[in-house]
Amino acid sequence: MSRYQSHSFDDGEINPFANPTSVPAATSKLSPLPPEPYDRGATMDIPLDSGKDLKAKEKELREKEAELKRREQEIKRKEDAIAQAGIVIEEKNWPPFFPLIHHDISNEIPIHLQRIQYVAFTSMLGLVVCLLWNIVAVTTAWIKGEGPTIWFLAIIYFISGVPGAYVMWYRPLYRAMRTDSALKFGWFFFTYLFHIAFCVFAAVAPPIIFKGKSLTGILPAIDVLSGNILVGIFYFIGFGFFCLESLVSIWVIQQVYMYFRGSGKAAEMKQEATRRAMMAAL
């Protein structure tokens, strides 16, 4: 074996200093890309209409802003005129979760009358509770075999009694307290007496006008107690509700009447009634 072995690079026939054209193709380099032409005086096309569009938009925004200010001033002027005329815009705000009526005692009722108004509102809610519990008790009696007629009557009492009480006596009292109107006070006294009479009648519930057991009075409670203790207990609870409602309502009408007489509204109402009668006669 020879001392030196031949190597693949030991090729004497390849001369690196030889003519480059004779170098094999594998060792040749790629030619670079030609440079891009440079034009120092080249210009960019900038749209000249963009400045005009901005000015037009600014002008449009200014016009809209001026229009909004003009409308705000017009609305404020109308509100001031309405306030000077004594007209109150009643926005529905109660109950908060589903507004049905306008009710804002703390901001619209004079502070010395707010206590009476709050108690009157309590009597309004008390009537709702009384008639609602009346439905529950009568439904229990119907299930125990008293018949469906009393249940339908209890539903009628609730459907007609709750909105009727609000329209007939609570809203007139609210407006009378707010505006200090003698005629509205007179209407409240007239309708609220019917409310008190109904509550007292319902607490007794004699079977003379309404179907006896359609109201949870003391007489139906004693009657049904002998047949079913549970129904009797429900009726006695309803009797207690109507008694409490009657007492609160009597207190309210006493307080309103004391204010009405003490403020001179009674004489004012007589004068107003006389004046209207004379105008009607003429």
Curated annotation (Swiss-Prot):
Residues 18-30 have a biased composition (Polar residues). Residues 48-93 form a coiled coil. Residues 1-117, 254-282 are cytoplasmic. The modification Phosphoserine is found at residue 31. Its main location: membrane. The chain crosses the membrane at residues 118-138, 150-170, 185-205, 233-253. Pfam families: SCAMP. Belongs to the SCAMP family. This is Secretory carrier-associated membrane protein 1. It comes from Arabidopsis thaliana (Mouse-ear cress).
